[in-house]
Amino acid sequence: ISQSGETADVLAAIDKIKPKKAMLITNSFTSQMTLHIPLILDMHAGKEIAVASTKSFNQSVLVFYTLIKQFKGEEPKEILNYVKNLEEIKKTFDNNIPKEISKMKNVFYLGHGYDYIISKEGALKLKEIAYIPTEGYSTSELKHGSLALISDKSAVIGLSSNDSFLISCLNEVRARGGKVFFLKNKYPGGLLGALSLSRYVQLIAYYTAKELGNDPDHPRNLAKSVTVI
């Protein structure tokens, strides 16, 4: 899987194994990888100019989800709630969150299960374009290091598509002076319930970068495709 189809380490691996039975999921049908892999699936994310990939991240997960459902002979019913959640995010996004995050010295995302994966996505995007030190942790790891870093200049963003344990973790942070935010879907459910939260955390990163005067499309020191190992 490659958004650009030009990533150097993936190209090196393809050249080494010379796959005859392989599938490429990409957002570029004119890349080098398409010359070496026989089966190609388009993400249909549309052109993505920004260095920090957002649309292609979301679309790649949707492609995998749809493939798995097809292999199992099941209907991808969760997609309906996924779309509903995206519509809710458009209507309910809180612009005060980026304003508060922009004042912080460090930020942590917390989540469990699929939400933990999205916590890593949220942390990466905030680091990439807002330049704020940010990490994504599982809720079970809160007391294994990250809690020691909490101060009144720290923010913790909890992601919960279906996990009630998160509330107690956020209370631990609040008791130590940290700022807490809680993000929850209106329509919870599985992988796509968590994936819809990725849109929210990506918007937080985008508007935090804008709040700090950064160019969210062209972050410093980063390139769209890693073409040199």
Predicted regions span which residues?
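A SIS-like phosphosugar-recognition module
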Residues: 1-229
